[in-house]
């Protein structure tokens, strides 16, 4: 039994990060990059010709493992998996990697179906905790049609997710909320394939498949559905 459609898929390409933000919901960075075998095994659970509406690459800091972003594109092409749109967020610190990240995102944009409705996105995150964004990084990404500023956040107004390092921040100063994991909802096709039409299907850097993305590395264990390498 394989997946023939998924509304929202997330792939964590690395747990490494070049910042150490006090509010990070993941917790402390770890020297772990996703292995290609996890990407392959995860995508092998999809039918040939399956459809992913939205595919998001997360970290850590995604620019520290651009090869995994490209490898995923190669892997979906090999399996004939169509993708509606992609979404990527970088902190912009690694100026020397921004041009390559921009090129990788263009390769994805060329492959995705939804090119004209601004569904795709490559954003630089900015908030009260991040280091200043280098001008060079902004300049490199600014020419992309799908470069957006929707990850600019004022955490004196917005709520922090009370996960990871954010648990150590003073609740009298910062508003917090507990993470909410939407239920993975699915239905079966007439041929027995699975359509995950609601919720987030998340492949993390150690090959675990998790229900929900906005969780610390510790909390991901609680919502783990299994490992991509498990016998199918």
What are the language-model segments listed below?
Residues 45-49, 77-80, 103-117, 142-144:
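Acidic (Asp/Glu)-rich catalytic clusters
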Residues 149-182, 214-232:
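C-terminal accessory region of radical SAM enzymes
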Residues 1-88, 95-100:
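Conserved alpha-helical substructure of the radical SAM core
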Residues 60-62, 91-93, 127-129, 157-164:
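Active-site beta-loop-alpha junctions enriched in small/polar residues
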Residues 55, 86-88, 122, 150-153:
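Hydrophobic/aromatic residues located in beta-strands of well-ordered beta-sheets
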Residues 114-130:
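Non-cysteine beta-strand/loop elements that form the S-adenosyl-L-methionine
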Residues 208-209:
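Hydrophobic "anchor" residues
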Residues 193-197:
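Short, small/polar residue-rich loop motifs at catalytic or cofactor-binding pockets
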């Amino acid at each position: 039994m394989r997946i023939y459609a998924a509304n929202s898929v997330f792939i964590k390409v690395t747990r490494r990060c070049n910042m150490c933000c006090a509010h990070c919901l993941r917790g402390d960075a770890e020297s772990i990059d996703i292995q290609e075998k996890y990407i392959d095994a995860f995508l092998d659970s999809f039918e040939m010709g399956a459809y992913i509406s939205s595919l998001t690459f997360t970290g850590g800091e995604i620019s520290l493992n651009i090869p995994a972003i490209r490898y995923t594109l190669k892997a979906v092409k090999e399996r004939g998996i169509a993708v509606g749109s992609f979404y990527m967020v970088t902190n912009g610190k690694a100026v020397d990697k921004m041009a390559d990240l921009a090129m990788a995102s263009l390769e994805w944009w060329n492959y995705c179906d939804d090119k004209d409705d601004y569904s795709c996105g490559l954003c630089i995150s900015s908030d009260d905790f991040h280091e200043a964004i280098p001008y060079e990084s902004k300049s490199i990404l600014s020419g992309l049609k799908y470069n957006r500023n929707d990850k600019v956040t004022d955490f004196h107004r917005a709520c922090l997710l009370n996960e990871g390092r954010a648990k150590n921040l003073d609740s009298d100063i910062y508003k917090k909320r507990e993470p909410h994991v939407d239920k993975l909802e699915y239905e079966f096709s007439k041929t027995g394939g699975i359509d995950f039409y609601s919720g987030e299907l998340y492949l993390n850097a150690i090959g675990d498949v998790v229900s929900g993305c906005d969780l610390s590395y510790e909390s991901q264990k609680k919502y783990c559905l299994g490992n991509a390498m498990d016998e199918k």
